[in-house]
Regions:
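Short loop/turn motifs that connect adjacent beta-strands in outer-membrane beta-barrel proteins
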Residues: 54-63, 122-133, 195-202, 242-259
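Predominantly the C-terminal beta-signal and adjacent terminal strand-loop region
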Residues: 228-309
Length: 309
């Protein structure tokens, strides 16, 4: 992880332009994983170093990058599946005032998302007016801290632990645990900017990629291979207070300070999870009819400041 961060910082320092963005929005997680029985969401903060588009030595070849750190607040969800089973058990309770149930779970998501884009400008009038087609290569390293959000009373869960071995095992999985995710993505990308006047431009960026990697949980010592699709849409306004060009012989530079306001939506759908049990690999596609498909999406509004020369 430290080597990855150091490499990203080095690339940023060597770049002729960079932008810092702060964003705030929502994060949603869906699917039959980690005890989820539906969809849960929370507010998130994002911190990004970015350069959307920079031409190489005045050519039509361009590159861009964005490195984003995300931190969510706590997501909570009741364990409805298991509590439904408990409701049935309560029917046999001679003292119906007692309620035996598994408490809700807390989830907190953090992580790094890094993307590099390279491509060719099919339209390149200047740095404020271009249309580029390229390739996205990236990786995502989030992790999910999860734990039960309350300690059940002896009168509630203890009966089921003592009398239902399967439920006892499931309850043990709801202790504090960390789920690490490492994925790689590659796919086509489009990048454009169009000036509205001398100081304001509108820009957009879209990507659709194949994403593959693994999900690992430390508590149950499990590791799942995952395959899916990633998509991202980013639109915004670009503001610069001045645009001047300075020439010294053959050298020409156009230093700028600028600001951005934008909106970014990204989504990762896990189409298949390969679960290896005792040497036998099972595909999660058999769970699709049960609506247990895993997915993540985020919507973020952001503001940024940057420079270029």
């Amino acid at each position: 992880m430290k080597k990855i961060v150091l490499s990203l910082v080095t690339l940023t320092l060597l770049s002729s332009a960079t932008e810092f963005q702060y964003g705030s929005g929502t994060f949603n997680m869906t699917g039959g994983f980690l005890g989820l029985t539906g969809s849960v969401g929370t507010d998130i903060d994002t911190f990004t170093l970015s350069e959307r588009h920079s031409n190489v030595a005045g050519s039509d070849i361009f590159y861009g990058y964005d490195f984003t750190w995300m931190d969510s607040k706590t997501l909570k969800q009741a364990q409805h599946t298991y509590n439904d089973m408990v409701t049935v058990a309560n029917g046999f309770n001679p003292m119906p005032t007692n309620k035996w149930e598994i408490p809700s779970m807390d989830y907190r998501v953090k992580g790094l998302d890094a993307n590099i884009r390279v491509g060719y400008d099919v339209v390149n009038e200047n740095q404020d007016n271009f249309l580029g087609l390229g390739l996205l290569i990236g990786l995502s390293i989030p992790w999910i801290d999860s734990s039960s959000s309350a300690v059940p009373s002896d009168d509630s869960i203890q009966f089921i632990i003592d009398n239902r071995e399967n439920l006892a095992t499931a309850y043990d999985y709801f202790e504090k645990t960390k789920t690490s995710i490492m994925t790689y993505k590659i796919g086509p990308s489009i990048n454009f900017q169009k000036s509205l006047n001398e100081n304001i431009s509108i820009y957009g960026l879209g990507s659709f990629a194949y994403q593959t990697g693994y999900i690992k949980n430390d508590h149950i010592d499990s590791k799942f291979s995952v395959n899916g699709t990633y998509q991202e849409y980013n639109v915004g306004f670009y503001f610069t207070p001045f645009t001047e060009t300075y020439k010294w012989g053959w050298l020409s530079i156009s230093p700028r300070l600028y600001g951005t306001l934008g909106y970014k939506y990204s989504k990762w759908d896990v189409d298949e999870m390969l679960i290896n049990t005792s040497g036998v690999e099972m595909s999660s596609k058999i769970l699709d009819p049960l609506g247990m498909k895993l997915g993540f999406d985020s919507s973020v509004a952001y503001a940024g400041v940057g420079y270029s020369f």
